[in-house]
Structures are given as structure tokens and as C-alpha cells.
Amino acid sequence: MPMLSEGRFLSTRARSNRIVWFVLLFQVATSIVSQAATNRIRTAHSIGWYNTFLTFRLSDKSSIQAEYQWRREGWISNWQQSLLRIGYHVQLHPRVTARLGYGWIETFPYGDIPLNGFGKQFTEHRLFQAIVLQDEVKRLSISQRWMLEERWLGRYASAASTKEEDFDLLGRIRYQVRLQHPISKPGDGQGHFYIATYDELFIGFGKNVKENVFDQNRLAGLIGFQSRSSFRVEAGFLQQLLQLGREVNGKNVFQYNNGVTVNLYYMLDLRKRN
């Protein structure tokens, strides 16, 4: 694969910034249209997502990341979702990283209208491919991620079924933009604090996608601490707008989930040193 030159990469910065603003405006417009719709059922939940990310650096340009996300409803009381994911990352350019991997997800029934029509827990097996673009404007870090997912969701034949009889294949595209800015100067090996925000839009596609072509949108505001280069922790608010893939009484169902998220990152350097 031909490498991007630094000059050519930087020449796309203005266009990249326009794309960021266009997508943000699109997401805001989507949210406004969603709020204005009348043929809908609204539900709301308090959520807490508690996540751990471990990165094993294999070389200067490659790494493996394993993550577990403990997603709860009622802040911490009830299961919402369990997500285990592992991926391989390769750096194509100092500012461009490619990722691919696998995820195992368990989604649980919660709230008055569960995601599964029979009110059952279901399994999802997921493959993903992603491109991450990093940029900086002075001290502001800008990260954009485009992700493609192939999702196999467990399906029950009836309410009496005790296990999933089949798995339906669904496609999904995700776009995330994240902004991060330090709020303290790095000390001598002491690390620094920062603030960050991100927004991520999910769009479903494929013959098995029903009502939720607009799948969900996530918005977060965070404060974090970066210790040197190996450890990072951040926490803040999380808003999830999610559309169910089915109608209830002829109406679309939207979840308005608000809560907290806590993310812990740690990197292990496995590169061989002379």
C-alpha cells in the first residue's frame, strides 16, 4: 500500500475539518428530527458504562487491543450489555491507523420495552474494520473513526424457545469524532489532565435491518488524566439515543439513555529492545 506523504496529508486538513463539521451538523439535524417525530414511544433509562482497554504494543507500528465494557442500567444495578472485544491495529501513517477485530456481546432485557421482542437475553458475534485519522490544531487533538461492522444477532423462534435457533446478519456503519484538549501542563513524568468530548453516529444497513436504519447516537463529555504514555483514566456523562429494530403497537420505540461512563486505558510495551 503506498504511503501518504506528510505534505499531501496536511493538504487535506481543511477538507477534513469541513467533513467533521458537516457530520456534526447532520447529527444535530438527525436529533432534532427525532425529537419532532410524533409516531413514537419514548423510554428513558439511567445507565453506567465501566470500561477497560488494554493495549499490547508489538512493534513501532502494530499492537493488539483487548477491551471489556461492563454496561449497566439503573446506574449499576442491572445488566444492560456485556461487550468483550479484541482487535489488531497497524499504523499506516503517523496519523492513520487501521484496525480489525472481533467482538462478543451479550444484550440483556431491561426496562419496560426490551430490545428483544420476547424479552430475552441474546448473543451477538461481531467483526469490525476501522480507519482512525488523527490530527492536531495547536493543542487540540482531533480523532475521526470510520468503522464497518458485520453483526450476527441471535434470534429466537418463539417466546417458548430456550435458546437462539439462528443468527441474523446485519451491517452497520459508525462514524465518531472526538476532540481532546489538555487543561494542565505535563509535569516531569507526572502526566496531565485533559477534557474531551465525542459524538458517534450509527447507521444500519442490509436486508435484516428493520426500523432502525438510524440505529443510535452517542454523545459524551469527559475529564481525564494521562500519566506518562502508558496509563490513562477518564470519566464523565454519556447520552445514548437508541432506536429499537421493531415497532410496538405500530409505533417506533426510542430509548433516551443518560448516565456516566468511566474508561481505564493501559498499555504494555512488548517491543524488543537491543
Predicted features and spans:
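Membrane-embedded beta-strands of outer-membrane beta-barrel proteins
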Residues: 52, 85-86, 129-131, 175-177, ...
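Short loop/turn motifs that connect adjacent beta-strands in outer-membrane beta-barrel proteins
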Residues: 60-61, 95, 136-143, 183-193, ...
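Residue-level signature of outer-membrane beta-barrel architecture
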Residues: 56, 90, 102, 133-135, ...
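Outer-membrane beta-barrel transmembrane domain signature
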Residues: 147-244
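Transmembrane beta-strands of outer-membrane beta-barrel proteins
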Residues: 64-66, 98-100, 140-146, 173, ...
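Transmembrane beta-strands of outer-membrane beta-barrel pores
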Residues: 68-74, 102-108, 135-137, 148-152, ...
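Residues that define the transmembrane beta-barrel architecture of outer-membrane proteins
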Residues: 46-48, 80-82, 123-127, 167-175, ...
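Outer-membrane beta-barrel "beta-signal"
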Residues: 131, 256-274
